[in-house]
Amino acid sequence: MTHLHITTWVVALILLFVSYSLYSSGSAKGAKITHMILRLFYILIILTGAELFVRFANWNGEYAGKMILGIITIGLMEMLLIRKKKEKSTGGLWVGFVIVLLLTVLLGLHLPIGFQLF
């Protein structure tokens, strides 16, 4: 299940950049399609993350923090695309998104069911 969860968020990140670039180039139809597919992946990320949480969590703060950071990451992804669609500035959101994404990934790798890279 860990591999499925990682695959869904990697695909979601790719779809985020594709949707963002399509909104930037003015291709509204293509951007809308990829944005809707990305929303499907949000649901898959949440479902696989919840399944991992229920199956492996020993109910401590690190797991709850990881879950909260993951939901914040998804929220920032959606906010980035909506603001880009409305042609508003996204600079601050990008900074926040990168910081929260890094924290989420690092915490996920640190947890016992993550890959022990460090």
Swiss-Prot record:
The keyword Membrane applies. It is found in: Cell membrane. It comes from the Bacteria. Keywords: Cell membrane, Membrane, Transmembrane, Transmembrane helix. The chain crosses the membrane at residues 4-24, 33-53, 62-82, 93-113. InterPro entries: UPF0344 (IPR010899). It is a multi-pass membrane protein. This is UPF0344 protein YisL. Belongs to the UPF0344 family. GO terms for cellular component: plasma membrane. HAMAP family: UPF0344 (MF_01536). Pfam families: DUF1516 (PF07457). The keyword Membrane applies.
